[in-house]
Amino acid sequence: MSDSPVTLPESIKLTEYSHGAGCGCKISPKVLSTILASQLPVFTDPNLLVGNQSRDDAAVYKLNDDIGIISTTDFFMPIVDDPFTFGRIAATNAISDIYAMGGTPIMAIAILGWPINKLPAEVAQQVVDGGRQACMEAGIMLAGGHSIDAPEPIFGLAVTGQIALTDLKQNDTAKAGDRLYLTKPIGIGILTTAQKQKKLQDEDSHIAVNAMCQLNTIGTTIAKISGVNALTDVTGFGLAGHLLEMCQGAKLTAKLKFDAVPLLPRALDYLALGCVPGGTHRNYDSYGEHLPELSEHQKAILCDPQTSGGLLVAVSAEAEAELIDLLDAHHIAPICIGSLETPTTEVNVVLC
């Protein structure tokens, strides 16, 4: 991972300039549903294959019978203190939505909000350079953008991608019998909250950063497995929230093996110190009625907001071995965390 090219004064800590952190500052699903409930007449475009109706990771527009264009945007406030790393994480997170649809990114433009009377422009320059670094790693140009004077630092991207329509994966197309796999461990919200609470040990500072800077490029290859029936990335709504979207969209119930859910190193240690982000509580308040009765420990893990989290994959039993081989080849632990079944209960997720 590249270091920031310019040394900043130790006194500049970006997380002290924001009230939220990363995807943990997302508006809750319940409130977002109210915001998106338009009062205008319905307008449709037959070439818009994926839009607001399905709560998916990105929009997809059909260009012709073979190719679709993917469009997405994502931005947030600082989740780490280092400007370059913040920009890199924000960009990595935004690009992830393209991979979550099974596509390939082709271009990005930047979104920057900056408190120009509080933080030097040179700090913003490093944030943008961090975004450029992530774009270069994804093989795309940061081709432009827009900036405003804002009370808190905000950075992200609008990303354009393309996809062969035969490879398109959505988050609401899972099937009964599918197995569930996760490509990154959970716990980013816990560890970044430990940093914000000044409880994070120096030797642990790399754990969440390394995870957040890892591009989900494997999504493009996963999508080529015909038995992968649904795909999404796990971000601000937590594992439970994004799993619920998958279940509700396909009218299925998930049997989740809680003890199999992979966790980042030291996540449980910092959870024991009370490092629970506010987004965890907002997530549970928003969708807890669709979950089984959970302990506080289970809530803290399943509802932990992830920033630049991994991919949640629903794969048929017949194609499971092919997915396992692919994950192994990319040095990702192929751990099955559950399965999807025809509903037998009013809740969408049960623990087993």
Swiss-Prot record:
Alphabetized SUPFAM superfamilies for the sequence: PurM C-terminal domain-like, PurM N-terminal domain-like
Residues annotated as site: Important for catalytic activity: 26
Listed cofactors: Mg(2+)
Enzyme class, spelled out: transferase
Enzyme Commission number(s) of this protein: 2.7.9.3
Domain of life, per lineage: Bacteria
Catalytic activity: hydrogenselenide + ATP + H2O = selenophosphate + AMP + phosphate + 2 H(+)
Listed Pfam families: AIRS, AIRS_C
Cofactor annotation remark: Binds 1 Mg(2+) ion per monomer.
Assembly, per entry: Homodimer.
Protein name: Selenide, water dikinase
Lineage: Bacteria, Pseudomonadati, Pseudomonadota, Gammaproteobacteria, Alteromonadales
